[in-house]
Amino acid sequence: MLEPLFRCNLACSGCGKIQHPTEILKQNLSPEACFAAVEECGAPVVSIPGGEPLLHPQIDQIVQGLIDRKKFVYLCTNGLLLEKSLSKFTPSPYLTFSVHLDGLKEQHDKCVDRDGVFEKAIAAIKAAKQKGFRVTTNTTVFADANPQEVQEFFNFLSDLNLDGMMVSPGYSYEWAPDQEGFLQREQTKALFREILAPWKSGKNKWNFNHNPLFLEFLMGETDYECTPWGSPSYSGFRLAKTLLSLKRRLLPNL
């Protein structure tokens, strides 16, 4: 997981990324720093979350450099800048845009706290597919989710000719403004058993971009021991904290 910046053009209530101090939000990892981290890690798949990666002034260079290294890149985006940014990229089997969508129009716009985001994201998805790009969606399910509405949403996504759908429970962010919507383990199992029942029975052939073992984990049918090295993450957060600490020591009155 490569996080070249934490800035975003949305303020989603279930996300704590933009709550970082200003010094951290100003940071952009250089393409060279990104390449060095990816080469050191050695993982074949690189997910680029945010903030909003398309705000990075050199995101096209970062993505192309990773593709040149034969890395499978999942560029996460809320879709607001995607359509006008497509000209910066070239369709490739190594590049997938992963568009954040947490439900149909009313639900998604509520989650991102801005009207019109859903429609703009859908338009961007269609434009990207028309130009030959791979596109998946990334959905977070929170505690107040209605299982039937989530199923309707998955049916809607299935008609968009996507290259896959990703879904995840709402994991806790310490700094997120809304702390009430995150799911505990037992809530997660009960909710996903209901949501995924049509998929489990074979009634709905939803095209999830997941190992089925993960979906079984969500439903509580299996369990795993997590490891901190299971998904290595690299960002400018540690560097920014070091610089801020140094600045405060050198300029104590600021």
List each model region and its residues.
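Short linear motifs in exposed loops
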Residues: 85, 244-247
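Membrane-interface junctions of multi-pass transporters
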Residues: 223, 246-254
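Short, surface-exposed charged micro-motifs
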Residues: 3, 233-234
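Radical SAM enzyme [4Fe-4S]-AdoMet core and its adjacent flexible, acidic
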Residues: 29, 69, 98-102, 110, ...
